[in-house]
Design a protein with these regions (language model features):
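Short, solvent-exposed loop/linker segments at the N-terminal edge
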Residues: 13-17
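Beta-rich carbohydrate-recognition and catalytic domains
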Residues: 1-11, 24-70, 74-220, 225-298
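Structural beta-strand segments of beta-rich domains
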Residues: 19-23
Length: 298
């Protein structure tokens, strides 16, 4: 696994909007100002500005046009760091953009170049946490980011990143935040613990991993529910190269130490049978990414 190592100066969040781009940056060096430039992909300069803010919005851009965002940190008039350049494309988007990665932006390779597997969690304090992994087919698929909002989702900021972490689900239980995730596509099933999403424990392994050829655990950010004194969530096993996935559940007592793998149980995995009553007709190879739900009768 090639680890993600943040640069001394980095654009850590992008939020394109209607004729605009918003971004957050972080610097691990001493600085007194930032110089921001926006170029078209043919090199034409569109905007330039100096700022002492780590959150910037630039407007007056053309929707549907690809741009290159460049950022340098300065101190006493000298450039002390240059951030990796970021691609973006403004446009009208529904809701609020938590984070954005242009499909041709390779900054997070080899994990991938597309945000995926979103998870959203409200803490007892009212703070919202949101996470996504970084995906692309046949890539490492092992990096996730966690963001926070303290104003009901109006604004967001980066809290942390987790690696290895893929297909992750945020959930809260008895005073702690957890991330249930894979180490990679069909990798090991892992569990992380945090107080508030900013810093995380080392992961513990709940199920051993496989690979795309042999098959392995598979999950998505599906609900974690409490029922009959246990926490439950859905888990699959298989791979597309093996023709599909079988389905199961994992669970743990609600009063157990969730970071103790010996406390967890797996039901085993039920292969799909197209002869089941009510099964879909056609070429389906099975079910995937199901929900654990509590029926009305308990």
């Amino acid at each position: 696994m090639q680890p993600y190592l943040p640069s001394p100066l980095e654009i850590v969040r992008l939020a394109p909007g209607d004729q605009s781009i918003g971004f957050d940056c972080r610097a691990a060096i001493d600085w007194d100002s930032f110089r921001v430039t926006v170029h078209t992909l043919d090199g034409s300069l569109v905007r330039t500005l100096l700022t002492d803010q780590e959150r910037v919005t630039i407007s007056g851009l053309a929707n549907g046009t690809n741009y290159l965002l460049c950022l340098t940190a300065q101190r006493a008039g000298r450039v002390v760091a240059e951030a990796p350049r970021r691609l973006f494309c403004p446009g009208r988007f529904p809701g609020t953009v938590v984070n954005y990665i242009h499909p041709d932006d390779h900054i997070y390779m080899p994990s991938g170049r597309s945000p995926a597997s979103p998870s959203l969690l409200r803490l007892p304090s009212g703070r919202l946490l949101a996470s996504h992994d970084v995906f692309w087919g046949e890539c490492d698929q092992n990096l996730s980011f966690v963001f926070a909002s303290d104003d009901e989702g109006v604004t967001w900021r980066l809290l942390s990143h987790l690696q290895p972490c893929f297909w992750g689900k945020l959930f809260y239980h008895r005073g702690a935040v957890y991330m249930l995730a894979m180490s990679a596509e069909y990798g090991a099933l892992l569990l992380y613990r945090s107080d508030d999403g900013r810093t995380w424990s080392e992961p513990v392994e709940l199920l051993p991993g496989g690979d795309r050829l042999r098959g392995g655990p598979h999950k998505a950010p599906m609900p974690v529910i409490a029922c009959h004194g246990r926490l439950w969530t859905a888990i699959d096993h298989g791979s597309w190269t093996r023709g599909g996935h079988a389905n199961g559940l994992i669970s743990v007592p609600v009063d157990a130490d969730l970071m103790d793998p010996s406390q967890w149980r797996c039901t085993g995995f039920l292969p799909y049978d197209p002869s089941w009553p009510g099964a879909s007709r056609g070429q389906s190879t099975g079910c995937l990414e199901g929900n654990a739900v509590v029926a009305p009768d308990g």
